[in-house]
Amino acid sequence: MKSSSILILVFIIFGLISYYLYYNVFDLLYNHKIHPLIEDYKKNFNRKNRSIEKQVVWTYIEDPIFFDQDYYLQLLEKKKNVPILFNFCLQILNSKINKEFNDLIVISPNNIKHYLPDFPIEMNAQSKYSQKFRVDLLASFLLSKYGGLFVSPGTVVLKDLDEIMYNLKFKYDLITFGGSIRNVNSCNDKNHPGNYIIGAKHSNPTILGYKKRMLENLHNNGYVDKLVGEDLLSYSIIENKPDKYFHFNCEYTGNVDYRNHVISLDHYFGYRPLDFKNEENLIFISFPYDLILYDKKYGWFNNLSEKQFVEADTNISIIVSKEIYNIK
């Protein structure tokens, strides 16, 4: 009987020790080893670092306020009211990116706060600010924080972007394209580039200065000039004098013909043949997307079906349709 009592007591003591070890040692192990791993995973998951581990090509798209046709835009995985030109340009851009090394991230009013929680203005077609100013401000924020290549909506990409992305990673800190709209004969002037397409490393001083000036302009002016972004980028370039900086002139952006005359948007929407200065050099054709969307004389083009777009046979529809055909 005595030995039985001792055995029971041993079992009780063993149980108490096991209980202590389970709830204290395991708790210690959890707090020091397991919990930090879970928190780190949650942090990384919420940040979605997997989306920006590679170099990023950024672009933006939104529903125009006038548009009433529905098209399925696979890149955004939802129905969006996007004119066929912008839909096609997005598909073409996607096809020119080597996904092994680079990602395409399409910013929209629905996801902008995920990437830029501190973005200071409403980013949709109902905003009081012009689309051009809003997109320029967006580019300055994205490139300052993440770096990469920002391609404005409605840009036709004619060559793969491997070389540009490689040079941006290993050779240059800043890459610009084309000439400023406001400055005549600026095609070869790297101090006055266009700002429809910009490549930069994150935290680049020139882009940080550009962003700062854009914000100052936003806060100090009741009305924001839609072309002010180009001016402010130029001021920042002149002020910072970037060393590792490369500029592609207008031969690469479809802005000029062989006589060095600017190719107008009306010419692209017309039927008279285009005489590019050097067609083999073309990388992008960047269009003033805000004019295409909101100038009444181009309104007919925004309501074309895919079939009507191809059959329109204008210069712009021929160029875009050819690139789409190469994808499909």
Where are the language model's segments positioned?
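Glycosyltransferase-associated regions of secretory-pathway enzymes
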Residues: 1-135, 153-328
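Small-residue hinge/turn detector
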Residues: 136-148
